[in-house]
Amino acid sequence: MDKTIYGQAFRFACTGVVNTLAGMAVMFGLYNIFGCSYWVSSAVNYTAISVLSYFLNRKITFGYSGKVLKSGIRFAVNIAICYLAAYGATKPLVMTVMADSPVKLRENAAMLAGMCIFTGLNFLGQRFFVFGEKKNMDYRKIYEKWVESPHLEESEKNVLAEMSEEEISDAFYRKLSFGTAGMRGVMGLGMNRMNRYTIRMAAKGFAGILGEGAKVAIAYDTRNHSDEFAKEAARVLAASGVKALLFDRYSPVPLLSFTVRDLKCDGGIVITASHNLPAYNGFKVYDCTGCQLGRESAAKISENIENLDDELGIPVSDEDDPNIEYIGQDVIDRFMDAVQKCGVDTAPEAASDLSVVYTPLHGSGREYVLETLRRAGFSNVTLVKEQADYNGDFPTVRKPNPEETAVFYIAEEKAKEIGADVIIGTDPDSDRIGAGVMHDGKIVYLSGNQTGALFVDFLARMRQSAGKKLITSIVTGDMGQDIAASYGVETIRTFTGFKDLAAEMNRHREDEILMAYEESYGYLTGTHIRDKDGISSSLVMCQMAAYWKQQGKTLIDVLEDLFAEHGYYIDDQLSFVFEGAAGADRIASIMKRFRSEGESVFADICELAELRDYSRGAEGVAEANVLKFMFSNGSWAAARPSGTEPKVKFYCCIKDRDREQAEKLHSLLKNRIEKEVEQA
């Protein structure tokens, strides 16, 4: 028998004490004081306290993280079987053994004996049936392997020893998955956590597809432990015969992508969790083109990780290994030169006349964005000093995400104070940019789709654009595409995620590309890298605002002009977060509901022209878990699980010549999605 049964039995007994005492009071009170029958007294008791017992044992005794509905049904079945077995069999037996005793004494004795038998059967049933799924029993074995490993330091073993059962379960019930976005998770000890051991596993898996003699560039952002994790990755690669080129300072994603191409590396690594909560970190991997890994390569790395003989004993080199080198300033200088080429020619007086407030949100973009704007002639730039320090706790925000307007509260105050024209902000790894515009005395924030549409219009206007290509994703709004068409620019759509946009770029000549962008605030206005770039996007944002200011317009004025020309667009995204194993099951259930109900989901709201199921390869896009509801008026809604966070995302793109009608349809779609998710 598994040795952990003793610990579980002890916790079961402890959580059961209160239930048992309360149950005895209810049962004997109903029987002896209120005169209820034997069966009524015992049934009321166990029905009431079983509900509490389920949640206590689920959380405390067994640390179970599976679906509530399934385990709840098993729990009810278990209670019924235990009750009938304990009390149905116990009463006749006690009545026979105590035949000469008074009836009341015999029935009290039968209830007491039944309770003892019920408790024992209930524990066994819960352990092996209710909460006994294999994945929830295996985590203990993995945990104990870590505790007993000679490769862990004593301080780490002490941390493991202090974990609660629930913490152990969540940290060890699965391995962090490795996909095309790499690996991302909460930092801490365990297979389901980001730590030096899981970093080593990922690095070893990557080394396995490269081979000896390969060359890999490694960057890291300002998140806690990012620099340590980067060095761990370098040590593993070096020990595997791979040359590791490491930055000696915080470096943004676009710089890493550029470096891979500039130094002709075989791949790249960035230690970052982008704009996730402070508790997270991640391991992003790039191919030789500076693009995030494709599905086939990611699958090979995942397979290599699964096949590791000793996950905790992966060989590492010393930090002074000759296979570890540091990247020089010359690479950074070439990157900064390349960023300038992503912009357009604007009058010097236009740049100096624009007032900009910039926040790096404690991330790696600070020096790069400031220097980029300085080189382009933007001399009136105010840095948000409260958010300028490198700090992985991101103390001034809940989440360092420039998609969320709440992070700009300090920047907005400064903008109003000095009368700034625009606010810009980059996330910790500086691949995304968010922006707000001073319009009629207040800051109006641009959505990712609106910024992309403005970029398309500006770049197409300022460059020779006819015949070029705009690359975007299947869940990005249509406004940019419609604007592009008016300039003779073709739009190519790929699966969501910039790796797919960048891979599409690789299929065309660089002079054929106008730009690439997606709705999640990621833009690439040049061809110097193969990932989104918050640094060059900051430059183009400021050049665009400066250009239109010279014409007497804000970017909001320009947006309204585009609405008047192309129609009114509302783009919205709804995200629903579901943590842990139970959350993953819930997300799967939601997608199943929308997929199975299909055409009926929005039938009473808007006529459905087509349901595109990308799991079947719709639009020629590689198979993906995405649904897109195409409506007859040109609007659409889409659903997909996030690839990097425990959430399911819904997208709405509504377009209509009548703004009021567009807003009405948006409200109806949003309410329907929320209702369907709640019921799934």
Walk through the language-model features, giving the residues of each.
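N-terminal small/polar loop signature for handling phosphorylated ligands or for N-terminal nucleophile
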Residues: A217-Y280, G377-G434
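Gly/Ser/Thr-enriched, mixed-charge loops and adjacent short helices
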Residues: E167-F172, L176, N281-V407, A415
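Short beta-alpha connecting loops at secondary-structure transitions
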Residues: G282-L293, D321-I324, G392-P400, A435-V444, ...
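Conserved phosphate/anionic-ligand binding catalytic regions in large, soluble enzymes, centered on
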Residues: F172-N192, S274, V356, P360-T372, ...
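An N-terminal, well-structured beta->alpha segment
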Residues: E144-R235, A239-S240, P322-D353, S364
